[in-house]
Amino acid sequence: MRTISLAKALLSLHLALLIPSAHADSLHDLQQALKKFEQSTPFSAQVTASVKNHSTEGDDQNVKEGHAQFAVEQNLAGLHIRYSPELLSNIDKEIETKKQNPQAPTPATEAMNRFNYSEISILLNPVRDIEDDLRKAQLVKEESVSYKGKPARLLHLQIPLEKLSEEERKNLKKYRTDLQIWIDESGTPLASRSIGKGSGRFALVIGFEFHFDVEKTYLTQGNRLLVAELSSTSGSSGAGMDTNEAITASLTLLN
């Protein structure tokens, strides 16, 4: 009996020692897979985007909504963003209408103002953003799961306040992001979700809070990783103001 108990104890210890190694292997697989994406394969795609912003200050409420569809093409000559004649016409009409009625809705203008290059690049270069998160994140655990009917691995990570850069930590008192990344058997990202919240103070007297929830699914085109679907909700409050925003975007390859 003593021999059996000792064998069980040794087996448990062996399995416990294997768990961190397995986690490290999956994280390593992801990091190595990201290096393979040189982000140089030419592509063209259609982007459909929408945004809704709701802000409140005292008794005043302001709701802005926007939606637009445009094409992007990236090759050796650079990035080309093409707006259709219909979209450009709608923006021109909204500008003229706004002159007559400052409260008139301007959905096309709102969408294009919101989806500038920095926002579009989130769809076009997720490798950069994932690698940035991994530099700050601490691995919590890994699961073997099924994603769209195929075997996958799910990494659970956390980004605490102390892992942020000095500039990012500025004015923050509390911060935490829980990050999930689904990868396939080779380590290629399939999807991700980041849920975060934080609070802090400006000038020692103005307190603020914020939260966000961002979901992404990915696709590959040659040696390029792209965001196929993005869904984001976020909110902040402070100095008597509350703001909530919801964004959705989809990217569909044309070639």
Give the ranges of each region predicted by the language model.
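Positively charged n-region of N-terminal signal peptides that target proteins for export
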Residues: M1-K8
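Bacterial N-terminal signal peptides
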Residues: A9-L18
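Sec/Tat signal peptide C-region and signal peptidase I cleavage site
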Residues: I19-A24
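Coil-to-beta-strand transition motifs
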Residues: P42, K150-A152, K174-R176, E185-A191, ...
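Short aromatic loop motif centered on NTY/YTY
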Residues: R193-T248
